[in-house]
Swiss-Prot record:
Site positions per UniProt: Important for activity: H97
Annotated function: Catalyzes the NADPH-dependent reduction of glutamyl-tRNA(Glu) to glutamate 1-semialdehyde (GSA).
Metabolic or biological pathway, per its Swiss-Prot or TrEMBL entry: Porphyrin-containing compound metabolism; protoporphyrin-IX biosynthesis; 5-aminolevulinate from L-glutamyl-tRNA(Glu): step 1/2
Catalytic residues as annotated in Swiss-Prot or TrEMBL: C49 (nucleophile)
Annotated residues for binding of substrate: T48, C49, N50, R51, S107, E112, P113, Q114, Q118
Entries under HAMAP family matching the protein: Glu_tRNA_reductase
Organism of this sequence: Maridesulfovibrio salexigens (strain ATCC 14822 / DSM 2638 / NCIMB 8403 / VKM B-1763)
Protein name stated in the entry: Glutamyl-tRNA reductase
Length: 439
C-alpha cells in the first residue's frame, strides 16, 4: 500500500470546551488547502461544537506528527498543548471511527441527527475544493450508507435528543417550568431553530432571535411567532430577557462581561441564565462571575444526556455490529486498490504476448485477407483474457483475506515477472538435476 489513511481529532470526551474552541477550524477550506500544499493527497476536515476531525490520505513519508504540527500552527497553538487532547486512528481504525461518527455513535448524544448533516456539508466543501478524491469519496459515501443502515435497522434515533433539546431541558431544571419566561436565541442556524421549537413547546412567554444577518433572524422569528433583534441593539434587548441560548459560528465571544455588568444592573439583578452551546464559545466566561448571572456551556449538558443514554445502549450494540461489518467491507475495497495495478499489468502482458504471437503467425501464413486477420487477432486476445480470468479471480478472493493482500500481489508479480526482473540462466539447473526420474 503506497498510502496511509489517518483520522486525527479531538472531541467532547478528549478535550474540554476551552481546548476545543482554541483548535476549532474557522476556515476549513484554507486549512485543507494548506495540507494539500504540504503534500497530502486527500483531506477533509470536520469542525463542530463537539469535535474537530481531520481525515487524511497521504504518502507514507507524511506522518501524524506532521499533521498535528500543521494544525497547531494554523490555530496559533502548540503541539505540546494539542497532542494530549487528541486521538489518532489509522487504516481501518480511521474508517471505523468515521462510520461511528456518521451514525452518531460517537456523539455526546448518541443517535442525534445533526452530525450526519454536518458531515455531508464538510464533504461537499472538500469535494468543491478538490481536496476529496478517490479514497475519501468512497469513505464518505460508504459512511452515509452505514448511517442509513443504522437508522433503518435499529431504533437508535427514536430515543435520541439533540444538543438544543438538552439545552432547553437544562433551562427547565434551572427554572422549574418555563411558562412566563422570556427567551432569546443568539444565532439563527439549525440548532437555534431546534431550540426555538423546544422552547415554544415548553411554554415560554416570548421568544426573540438575534443574528448578525438580520434577515435570517426575521425569517426564523416569523416562523416561530417571535421577534427579530438586531445585533446593534442586542444588549438593550437582553435587559428584558431571562433565558439566553447562544449558538453562533462566530470565531470570538459576542457577549462580553463588561457589557453584561451594565445589563444586570439595569435588570435590578433579576437572575439571568445563559446556555452557550457554541464552540468557540459565544459568551465571555467571566460573565459567570457577575451577580445573579448563571452561565452554562456545552459540557454542562452531559447530565441531561446521561439520563437519555441507557435507553439507547441496546440499539448501540446493534449499530456497532453494522459498523464492524461495513468497515471490513471497506477494507476489502482498499485491498482491491492495491491489486488493481497488478491486474492492469497482467492484462497488458497478456496483450503484448498475444500481439507478438499473432505477428509470428501472420508472418508464417503470408498474405491473409482483412477478415481472417481480424478473426486471428480476436482469437489471440480472447485466449489471453480467458487464461487470466481464473488467476485474477483467485487474486481478488485472496486479497480480501486480512493481511494477505501484499503477499499475493507480490506472488503474482513474481510469477508473471511483471517487474521484468532478470532471471539467471542457471536458476533452475539444480532443480532439474535433483528431479526424480520416476516422477
Amino acid at each position: 500500500m503506497d498510502h496511509n489513511i489517518y483520522l486525527i481529532g479531538l472531541n467532547h470526551r478528549s478535550a474540554g470546551v476551552d481546548v476545543r474552541e482554541r483548535y476549532a477550524l474557522t476556515n476549513v477550506e484554507e486549512f485543507e488547502s494548506g495540507l494539500l500544499e504540504l503534500g497530502v493527497r486527500e483531506v477533509m476536515a470536520l469542525s463542530t461544537c463537539n469535535r474537530v476531525e481531520i481525515l487524511v490520505v497521504c504518502a507514507p513519508e507524511i506522518t501524524q506528527p506532521n499533521i498535528l504540527e500543521y494544525w497547531a500552527k494554523r490555530c496559533c497553538g502548540s503541539v505540546s498543548e494539542l497532542e494530549p487532547n487528541t486521538y489518532c486512528h489509522d487504516g481501518l481504525n480511521a474508517v471505523k471511527h468515521l462510520f461511528r461518527v456518521a451514525c452518531s455513535l460517537d456523539s455526546m448524544i448518541v443517535g442525534e441527527p445533526q452530525i450526519l448533516g454536518q458531515l455531508k456539508d464538510s464533504y461537499r466543501k472538500a469535494v468543491e475544493a478538490g481536496a476529496a478524491r478517490v479514497i475519501i469519496n468512497r469513505m464518505l459515501h460508504k459512511s452515509f450508507f452505514v448511517a442509513k443502515r443504522v437508522r433503518t435497522e435499529t431504533s437508535i434515533a427514536s430515543s435520541a435528543v439533540s444538543i438544543s433539546y438538552a439545552a432547553v431541558e437544562l433551562a427547565k431544571k434551572i427554572f422549574g417550568e418555563l411558562e412566563g419566561q422570556r427567551a432569546m436565541l443568539i444565532g439563527a442556524g439549525e440548532m437555534a431553530e431546534l431550540a426555538a421549537t423546544h422552547l415554544l413547546n415548553s411554554g415560554v412567554e416570548q421568544i426573540s432571535i438575534a443574528n448578525r444577518t438580520y434577515s435570517r433572524a426575521e425569517d426564523l422569528a416569523k416562523c416561530m411567532g417571535g421577534s427579530a433583534v438586531s445585533f446593534d441593539n442586542l444588549y438593550d434587548h437582553l435587559v428584558e430577557t431571562d433565558i439566553i441560548i447562544s449558538s453562533t459560528g462566530a470565531p470570538h465571544a459576542v457577549i462580553s462581561a463588561k457589557e453584561m455588568k451594565k445589563v444586570i444592573k439595569k435588570r435590578k439583578y433579576r437572575p439571568m441564565f445563559f446556555i452557550d452551546i457554541a464552540v468557540p464559545r459565544d459568551i465571555d466566561p467571566d460573565v459567570n462571575g457577575l451577580d445573579n448571572v448563571y452561565l452554562y456551556d456545552i459540557d454542562d449538558l452531559k447530565d441531561v444526556v446521561e439520563e437519555n443514554k441507557s435507553q439507547r445502549e441496546d440499539e448501540a450494540i446493534k449499530a456497532n455490529s453494522i459498523v464492524e461489518f461495513e468497515t471490513l467491507s471497506f477494507g476489502n475495497w482498499i485491498n482491491s486498490l492495491d491489486l488493481q495495478p497488478t491486474i492492469v499489468d497482467l492484462f497488458n502482458r497478456s496483450e503484448n504476448v498475444a500481439q507478438q504471437e499473432l505477428a509470428k503467425t501472420l508472418k508464417r501464413l503470408g498474405d491473409v485477407d482483412a477478415k481472417t486477420h481480424k478473426a486471428l487477432e480476436t482469437m489471440a486476445m480472447s485466449i489471453g483474457k480467458k487464461l487470466l480470468h481464473e488467476p485474477v479471480a483467485f487474486l481478488k478472493r485472496r486479497t480480501e483475506e486480512e493481511g494477505k493482500a501484499d503477499e499475493f500481489v507480490d506472488l503474482a508479480r513474481r510469477m508473471f515477472n511483471l517487474d521484468n526482473e532478470t532471471i539467471p540462466a542457471d536458476a533452475h539447473c539444480g532443480r532439474k538435476k535433483n528431479r526424480n526420474p520416476e516422477n
